[in-house]
Design a protein with these regions (language model features):
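Cell-wall polysaccharide-cleaving catalytic domain and substrate-binding groove, primarily
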Residues: 1-86, 95-180, 184-189, 193-212
Length: 212
């Protein structure tokens, strides 16, 4: 990794980067309010001064993974030493996750507009819940589907980019619909229309975007 902590802090300001981190958290099952305090198996811990480094027996699997991005203790320690991270606070976890994305060779392709599925494939060896090009976990564990992850990523990046009070559907091949806070249209009807348009978009564009 040639980047510094300051570099990753800067990259974190990119809404698309935050959407990617949110997607990884969603795949790992830590997207809730306690994500940064979540241990393997769903339990939580309070001390964010360091990685808890506690092995949890989940029955089929045993793991010491913890935090929003389910860091293994040795992995987090290694990245912390390289970047000068002195705690396990949310910001430190975000920076460390970006460093792992970078280490897997996925950060530059992602920032450069690489296909979402290819980015997931690059990250699959780091996060078992992310799918390879074959749609399976790199480690044979439960995995999120690529379509599910892409929809979640789009929902996160769209929410971050859209102006407050306005959600616009893309106009290529579908009718454009706006929901504006000023006009207060019939929300149920608009929501139904947007669901239809979303399905049309997924069918029209997803095969060209994601390598299934």
């Amino acid at each position: 990794m040639g980047r510094t902590r300051a570099d990753y802090e800067r990259i974190l300001q990119n809404p698309k980067t935050r959407a990617l981190l949110n997607t990884i958290s969603y795949a790992e099952g830590t997207s809730g309010p306690d994500g940064y305090r979540t241990m393997f198996g769903g339990g939580t811990f309070d001390d964010l001064s360091r990685h808890p480094d506690r092995v949890i027996d989940g029955g089929r699997y045993r793991s010491a993974a913890a935090g929003r991005y389910q860091f293994m203790p040795d992995t987090y320690q290694e990245v912390s030493n390289q970047l000068g991270l002195s705690d396990f606070q949310p910001r430190s976890q975000d920076v460390a996750a970006l460093a792992l994305i970078d280490r897997r060779g996925a950060l530059d392709p992602f920032l450069g507009g690489e296909k979402f599925g290819k980015v997931m494939n690059l990250l699959a060896p780091e996060w078992a819940s992310l799918p390879t090009n074959e749609g399976a976990s790199y480690y044979g564990q439960p995995v999120k589907g690529i379509g599910d992850l892409y929809q979640y990523y789009q929902s996160q990046s769209g929410a971050l980019d859209a102006p407050t009070g306005t959600v616009a559907a893309p106009t290529s091949g579908v009718t454009q619909v706006f929901i504006k806070g000023d006009d207060e249209p019939k929300k149920e009807k608009a929501s139904s229309l947007l669901d239809v348009f979303k399905e049309q978009l997924m069918q029209q564009f997803l095969p060209n975007i994601l390598p299934f």
